[in-house]
Amino acid sequence: MSRTVFCVRLNKEADGLDFQLYPGELGKRIFDNISKEAWGQWQHKQTMLINEKKLNMMDPEHRKLLETEMEGFLFDGKDVVIDGYTPPSE
């Protein structure tokens, strides 16, 4: 049986993550307040950020940038802005 959380990103009850995917207090906050669906949305944006900005995950500054973007996306409702990216038309 899956657990449900009130997802602050989607503003609704939804299936929660199966386990804590991120370390520390932020990871606990994500586990308690973010749904699988919202986490999937973040993973998509994260991949775009890493690729388009050519981030190196071995660089502590790049990891901090990604963490800041993640917090903004998941908890503050900020969308990830990638210069020059045009979403495909539907």
UniProtKB/Swiss-Prot annotation:
The keyword ATP-binding does not apply. Belongs to the Fe(2+)-trafficking protein family. Transmembrane segments: none annotated. One of its GO terms (molecular function) is iron ion binding. One of its GO terms (biological process) is cellular response to oxidative stress. This is Probable Fe(2+)-trafficking protein. Keywords: Iron. Could be a mediator in iron transactions between iron acquisition and iron-requiring processes, such as synthesis and/or repair of Fe-S clusters in biosynthetic enzymes. The keyword Iron applies. It comes from Aliivibrio fischeri (strain ATCC 700601 / ES114). It comes from the Bacteria. Pfam families: Iron_traffic. InterPro entries: Fe_traffick_prot_YggX, Fe_traffick_prot_YggX_sf. GO terms for cellular component: cytosol.
